[in-house]
């Protein structure tokens, strides 16, 4: 298993941050990493997500929503072809801290193909997470 973890403090409520994270139709306006997202934010829903990691070609996949708790957590599982080949569990967790919200944004990768991917794609994904986090912070903190 490989894990990418990022965290950012946002001077906004968890409610505001959740509102931005769950409004998929606005992603093309502000999100430099997840450039398109479609589907319902509810457990069991199938999403259509297009990511654009820095320096890499965009990729579209159809993950399954595992957890959707407003103002707390959004989690989905994406798979390459069949379970266990290459899986990615993408997690957004929101933690309210007084007037600020801490966003924990991570992904757990697993599967038999994982050793073949090397560090390049995972580094690009980390950079994409950090760019998305910064853009989310900017949008949430705007008046």
Residue ranges: model-predicted function:
Residues 38-83, 97, 134-143:
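Glycine-rich portal/gate segments that line the openings of hydrophobic small-molecule binding cavities
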Residues 58-60, 85-89, 113-119:
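A short, polar/proline- and glycine-enriched secondary-structure boundary/capping micro-motif
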Residues 1-42:
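Hydrophobic ligand-binding cavity/cleft-lining segments
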Residues 102, 108-143:
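A conserved amphipathic terminal alpha-helix motif
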Residues 63, 76, 90, 104-107:
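Polar/charged side chains located within well-ordered beta-strands of beta-rich proteins
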Residues 9-13, 50-52, 95-97, 106-110:
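Solvent-exposed residues in well-ordered beta-strands and their adjoining turns
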Residues 6-8, 61-67, 88-96:
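Hydrophobic/aromatic beta-strand elements that line small-molecule binding cavities or substrate pockets
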